[in-house]
């Protein structure tokens, strides 16, 4: 069953999402943002500005999912201009960040996170692991830039929907 905004709002008041925006925010200080907050059947999470790491190829190495080492992940610089704070994800690259919001999933619900079309249109694909019943914390957000151009990944703006 997909939960609606009323249920999400009630659960947020009990600590399910923090910080919580009770409405879908599309503008901040009269400037457009990639929306975040509560929508009809979901909640748009934001990427934290605290840490974003980009996968870099190290010649002679092979990435092994059974023996992963973070040596291939390097911190990305946080940029800022009139459009907001952002990281640059190089073409055909992969990045990891963390959600600004902390979630506390109820013990009888599993949360599914999906990417948003705003980013998919520019080739930025979000791959997020479901948060299982009872899980607590800040979700790791995974982004793949499938385009041939570098992409901005905005911090504190919408990234995925829970």
Name each model feature, range by range.
Residues 1-162:
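DUTPase catalytic domain/fold
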């Amino acid at each position: 069953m997909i939960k609606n905004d009323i249920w999400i709002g009630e659960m947020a008041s009990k600590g399910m999402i923090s910080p919580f925006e009770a409405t879908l925010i599309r503008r901040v200080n009269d400037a457009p943002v990639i929306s975040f907050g509560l929508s009809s059947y979901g909640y748009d999470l934001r990427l934290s500005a605290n840490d974003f790491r980009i996968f870099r190829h190290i010649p002679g190495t092979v990435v092994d999912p059974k023996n992963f080492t973070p040596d291939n992940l390097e911190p990305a610089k946080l940029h800022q201009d009139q459009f907001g704070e952002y990281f640059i994800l190089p073409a055909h690259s992969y990045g990891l960040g963390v959600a600004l919001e902390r979630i506390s999933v109820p013990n009888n619900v599993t949360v599914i996170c999906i990417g948003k079309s705003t980013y998919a249109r520019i080739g930025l694909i979000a791959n997020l692991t479901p948060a299982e019943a009872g899980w607590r914390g800040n979700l790791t957000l995974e982004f793949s830039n499938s385009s041939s151009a570098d992409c901005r990944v905005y911090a504190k703006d919408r990234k995925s929907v829970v």
